Amino acid sequence: MASILSKKQKKNEKYTLKELKSLGHDLLTSRSHINNLPLLLTFVSPESPPQFVVESLLSLQSFFTPLLSQLPPTSSSPSSTKTEDPEVVFKAWLRSKFDEFVKLLLDVLVSQQSEDSLRGIVLGTLMEFVKLLNAGRFHSSIYHRLLDAIIHSEVDIEIFLDILTSKYFKYIDVRYFTYISMEKFVKTLEASVSADRTVIENNEAESDSKESLELSVRKIYQVLSQIPPPEKQAEKSQHEMWSGSDESISEKPTDKKKKTEKGDSTLLSPATISKRMKLKFTKAWISFLRLPLPIDVYKEVLASIHLTVIPHLSNPTMLCDFLTKSYDIGGVVSVMALSSLFILMTQHGLEYPFFYEKLYALLVPSVFVAKHRAKFLQLLDACLKSSMLPAYLAASFTKKLSRLSLSIPPAGSLVITALIYNLLRRNPTINHLVQEIVENADEANTEAGEHNESQPKTIKKRKLGIDYFNNQESDPKKSGALKSSLWEIDTLRHHYCPPVSRFISSLETNLTIRSKTTEMKIEDFCSGSYATIFGDEIRRRVKQVPLAFYKTVPTSLFADSDFPGWTFTIPQEEGTC
């Protein structure tokens, strides 16, 4: 193979660019120079200089374009008869050369030796053939081969996506057949994955196949995410076609007679086109989400699926299996799946009986420092907004959040306090969790029974030492939250961070006047951090300036009285007195 390529290169080196232009001109002017066609094809190669490739490409494109409607559908030789028509044989030969030309263009397109400008020209040529080859109908076969070469190439797909997005994805038939091709690629990958599971191979081969699978999955996701979503019929009544005919996305009739009877008269209404686009969009995405996604792609999909996919699906509940499986994984993945699952439950009637149990399990300290904590906390507040929430469930979430407030940063304690405040306002049945101070009741008991001082002391110790809430229990029904109290919130009154203690004090006064207070907006607290708390503190106007008066000038930063029982001496270096 290498010797053949070297011979071609040596043969091509004999021609100059001017001579190459002359060969193309002769081919276009007279049929007698048809032998220039195979010669020009030899220059369409990644090894050829870019200017030679472009010149040959332009000549061959100009030659084939007027003949596309006359070429047979395949390059197979005509049926052997006694009198073969030379014209039929000639057109079959032209078709074989055209197929060779397309194959060479695809090789140049995905070659790592090709320049980006050359790739743009080649891609434009192939898209012109897609437009013209099938007599005004979209030629899906060439387009599928084009996408297949892009998906399975080692070249960065962003180079091709920039061109496709800017020039071609605005046409509805291009998007339509892109979804069809993506679905076919996914089915091929699914078959290869199932085959790999049944065949036991060595570790190197297994790792190579896994890497190639992940690369293909990433490229398919990049293509799907770059395609504009299906447009609603009300937004745009006329759809722009690359092929210029609505028949491109019509169903193919099985009967040849019916096909000829329909002819070019079949025009689809915008509503029908929108329906079929939505159907192909749904099939492509649902089939893609069945693949084993790499973790980075998994997170990207979950972060955007509620905005880019769910609103455009023909039946959003088809995502039920994917989202419930993601929600059951736990950790960050569950947090990211919560938004989409909540949309399916509230807007599309999805029933998920273990939703609140899984949500309860997500309440761990790491959630309050996660990347998507702001969205999660807002969704948490929305999920607990119903006044029909059972008392045990509201109490369990309230108690779980209050316990978390002791072990998270101050910004998290602020948002937790706001969440608890909203829960108490929405669910009057759990107001008993906010108890009076225990010592006051005990003092009243001791005054009434001074003759028996030992018994009240025992009761006091027992009341202060028991909390029936089990923080390790994953089932809210068994947590025992209804028998507990929010002593953690009382602890926050002595928090080291002044904004937290001030916030708790303000809530104590507000809770006594429920009719004149409103729920707190959780989004106002979600973006808090050490930096925002510090910034708010230094911007506060201080009414009293704290001053320190010393009768004598201090000789050290800390006085000895600050460290009773300790003696600090400065060790002297050797050789000094």
UniProtKB/Swiss-Prot annotation:
Disruption phenotype: Pale seeds with arrested embryo development at the globular stage in homozygous plants. In heterozygous plants, slight accumulation of the 23S-like precursor P-A3. Altered maturation of 5.8S rRNA with an especially impaired processing at the 5' end. Keywords: Membrane, Nucleus, Ribonucleoprotein, Ribosome biogenesis, rRNA processing, Transmembrane, Transmembrane helix. InterPro entries: CCAAT-binding_factor, Noc4. It is found in: Nucleus membrane; Nucleus, Nucleolus. Coiled coil: none annotated. The chain crosses the membrane at residues 329-349, 350-370, 404-424. The keyword Nucleus applies. It holds the Pfam family CBF. Residues 230-263 are annotated as: Disordered. It is a multi-pass membrane protein. GO terms for biological process: embryo development ending in seed dormancy; rRNA processing. The keyword Transmembrane applies. GO terms for cellular component: nuclear membrane; nucleolus; nucleoplasm; ribonucleoprotein complex. Its main location: nucleus. Mostly expressed in flowers and stems and at lower levels in roots, hypocotyls, siliques, leaves and seeds. Component of the ribosomal small subunit (SSU) processome composed of at least 40 protein subunits and snoRNA U3. Belongs to the CBF/MAK21 family. Essential protein required during embryogenesis. Involved in nucleolar processing of ribosomal RNA (rRNA) 40S and 90S ribosomal subunits and ribosome assembly; early in ribosome biogenesis, especially required during the maturation of 5.8S rRNA. Has a role in the nuclear export of 40S pre-ribosomal subunit to the cytoplasm. This is Protein NUCLEOLAR COMPLEX ASSOCIATED 4. It comes from Arabidopsis thaliana (Mouse-ear cress).
